[in-house]
From Swiss-Prot:
PROSITE patterns: ATP_GRASP (PS50975), SUCCINYL_COA_LIG_3 (PS01217)
InterPro entries registered for this protein in UniProt: ATP-grasp, ATP-grasp_succ-CoA_synth-type, ATP_grasp_subdomain_1, Succ-CoA_synthase_bsu_CS, SUCC_ACL_C, Succ_CoA_ligase-like_bsu, Succinyl-CoA_synth-like
Residues that, per the record, bind substrate: 264, 321-323
Cofactor (UniProt): Mg(2+)
Protein keywords: ATP-binding, Ligase, Magnesium, Metal-binding, Nucleotide-binding, Tricarboxylic acid cycle
Annotated positions binding ATP: 46, 53-55, 99, 102, 107
Pathway in which this enzyme or protein is active: Carbohydrate metabolism; tricarboxylic acid cycle; succinate from succinyl-CoA (ligase route): step 1/1
Organism listed in the record: Pseudomonas syringae pv. syringae (strain B728a)
Known function: Succinyl-CoA synthetase functions in the citric acid cycle (TCA), coupling the hydrolysis of succinyl-CoA to the synthesis of either ATP or GTP and thus represents the only step of substrate-level phosphorylation in the TCA. The beta subunit provides nucleotide specificity of the enzyme and binds the substrate succinate, while the binding sites for coenzyme A and phosphate are found in the alpha subunit.
Protein name, entry field: Succinate--CoA ligase [ADP-forming] subunit beta
Gene it is expressed from: sucC
GO BP terms, alphabetized: succinyl-CoA metabolic process; tricarboxylic acid cycle
Complexes and interactors: Heterotetramer of two alpha and two beta subunits.
Domain ATP-grasp: 9-244
GO MF term (any one): ATP binding
Length: 388
């Protein structure tokens, strides 16, 4: 689960980290009032969406009057912000963050992720702040500094000081960085985060360090023990198809192709997407119906897949283990009839009663193509999507 910038900064403040004074507002009038509360003559207004690249898309602006702040809120509230990290529809803006202006001398980067290979939290720091860190890691990996956190003892101040020295910080900045480093590490562990970024972490004109941005992603599997953070969830930022899928315990991720994929098992789903790509097709989604490919789940899966107007054909790849393939085939037939599927559907069944399942599909009289193998299924669905 992603958090908005203002929510991330709220958590930063709770851990004693330096953040700008600001208010999240949802009306133009509240934006103007926020300027009065903050004081000063310059403010930064930011559209709140779960995506990066807001500045280049016009979603971040420096304003010098509360009227301009209100105008910015009027411009964006209720609209959709399109950035390089969103799809063509963009993300809806329901909140504007109004905060004090910061005089920046230098921008740094500080972030943390769970490193699966070492099974540790790993902090990354760089002198190249304010830019896409993935590009820096790809083009100049030597500019990425790392510190691995031992889960038994947690982040240690000496690790923060070591990173600070490597970043070229001096004097009070070293102490400040170490405090920010250990504070972020504690926040990361306390709240079961999957990712945390401060980009940029800035050196102000007076030499002090300041967290100018906050990006936080929480491990969805840990939400059951983070009741406080459940209230931070903003459903307006969810993909409606993914939200629909979650209600039926389906794992769905939208992609940009035209071949819908319905599979039971995450590994098989990824393999299916790979083989579709191998044969020249482009998957429109990742969809794992899980172990129980019942008629109800298959029906909802079809509804979700077909809600994407780009889908020209559907590949159903099911391995029958405990559930027999003939029962799965009957569920697929019932779902196709109920939903009224008009596009070609290619089905590959393997496992328990696979031959009987293929026979049931062949005798259904529906526009369902029974594939003999995974390769055959991929070839058939690519042809069907191309109208051949």
């Amino acid at each position: 689960m992603n958090l908005h910038e203002y929510q991330g900064k709220q958590l930063f403040a709770e851990y004693g980290l330096p953040v700008s004074k600001g208010y999240a507002v949802d009306t133009p009038e509240a934006a103007a009032e926020a300027c009065d509360k903050i004081g000063g003559t310059e403010w930064v207004v930011k559209a709140q969406v779960h995506a990066g690249g807001r500045g280049k898309a016009g979603g971040v602006k420096l304003v010098r009057s509360k009227e301009d702040a209100a105008a910015f809120a009027q411009q964006w509230l209720g609209k959709r912000l399109v950035t390089y990290q969103t799809d063509a529809n963009g993300q809806p803006v329901t909140k504007i963050l109004v905060e004090s202006c910061t005089d920046i001398a230098k921008e740094l980067y500080l972030g943390a992720v769970v490193d699966r290979s070492s099974r540790r939290i790993v902090f990354m720091a760089s002198t190249e702040g304010g830019v896409d860190i993935e590009k820096i890691a790809h083009d100049t990996p030597e500019k990425i500094l790392k510190a691995t956190i031992d889960p038994l003892v947690g982040a240690q101040p000496f690790q923060g000081r070591d990173l600070a020295f490597q970043l070229g910080l001096e004097g009070k900045q070293v102490t400040q960085f170490a405090k920010i480093f250990t504070g972020l590490a504690k926040l990361f562990q306390d709240h079961d985060l999957a990712l945390l970024e401060v980009n940029p972490l800035v050196i102000k004109a007076d030499g002090d360090l300041h967290c100018l941005d906050a990006k936080i992603n929480i491990d969805a599997n840990a939400m059951y023990r983070q009741p406080k953070l459940k209230g931070f969830h903003d459903p307006s930022q969810d993909d409606p198809r993914e939200a629909h899928a979650a209600k039926f315990e389906l794992n769905y991720v939208a992609l940009e192709g035209n071949i819908g994929c319905m599979v039971n098992g995450a590994g098989l789903a990824m393999g299916t997407m790979d083989i579709v790509n191998l044969h020249g097709g482009k998957p429109a989604n990742f969809l794992d119906v899980g172990g129980g490919a019942t008629k109800e789940r298959v029906t909802e899966a079809f509804k979700i897949i077909l809600s994407d107007a780009n889908v020209a054909a559907v590949l159903v790849n099911i391995f029958g283990g405990i559930v027999r393939c003939d029962m799965i085939a009957e569920g697929i037939i019932g779902a196709v009839k109920e939903v009224g599927v008009k596009i070609p559907v290619v089905v590959r069944l393997e496992g328990n009663n696979a031959e009987l399942g293929a026979k049931v599909l062949a005798e259904s009289g529906l526009n369902i193509i029974a594939a003999t193998s995974l390769t055959d299924a991929a070839q058939q669905v690519v042809k069907a999507a191309e109208g051949k």
